[in-house]
A protein has these predicted regions:
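A structural motif corresponding to the C-terminal lobe/cap of the Radical SAM core domain
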Residues: 1-135, 142-143
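Terminal or standalone catalytic/regulatory effector modules within metabolic enzymes
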Residues: 132-180
Length: 180
């Protein structure tokens, strides 16, 4: 785990997918301690094998021009094999569970405690104004404003004591959660 930051992406909405896919994703991410787990709903991209199969089956609900670019204007762009409401509910529930502040902090803390110190040492430099602003935002939101502030400070000081070489990265990854 030295120098590698694990990230994982999960897609929900496949044909043949059984109920509970979202919970299985949450369970996997929790058991493995992956700090950054991205979730998405399946989209059929134009001119792919999936697109052609769904087109042949009459299941596409979006034409090719609408399917280009950002695929975040609808849940799925095809008719799934199980109810779309179930898929959407599982997606939202899984996402909210993964990024619930306590669960997210627990995963990030556990992960960075296990990380070894980087072998390559960069040259030390003073933080930029952007770095100072970002740190201030994290401290304000996570260390003062939220009800998770006790956990934040416990984990921050724990990381500083037990794995100081990873403290900066720990804070950076905690900050990533600020856009959710």
């Amino acid at each position: 785990a030295n120098g590698i930051r694990v990230m994982a992406g999960f897609i929900i909405g496949f044909d043949g997918e059984k109920d509970g896919a979202g919970l299985r994703i949450v369970d996997f991410v929790t058991r493995t301690g992956i700090p950054a787990a991205m979730m998405g709903m399946l989209q059929a991209l134009p001119q792919t094998a999936l697109w052609h199969r769904l087109e042949k089956e009459g299941r596409l609900i979006q034409d090719e021009s609408a399917a280009k670019g950002v695929n975040q204007t609808n849940l799925l762009n095809f008719k799934p094999t199980r109810p779309i409401r179930d898929i959407a509910n599982e997606y939202v529930e899984a996402f909210c569970t993964l990024y619930e502040p306590n669960a997210y902090m627990d995963r990030v803390y556990s992960y960075y405690l296990k990380m070894g110190a980087p072998r390559w040492k960069g040259t030390s430099k003073l933080p930029t104004w952007t770095d100072v602003k970002a740190l201030s935002i994290v401290i304000w939101r996570q260390g003062l404003k939220r009800d998770t502030r006790g956990r934040f400070w416990r984990y921050l000081f724990g990381m500083a004591r037990q794995n100081p070489a990873m403290l900066e990265q720990f804070i950076v990854v905690l900050a990533h959660n600020e856009h959710f």
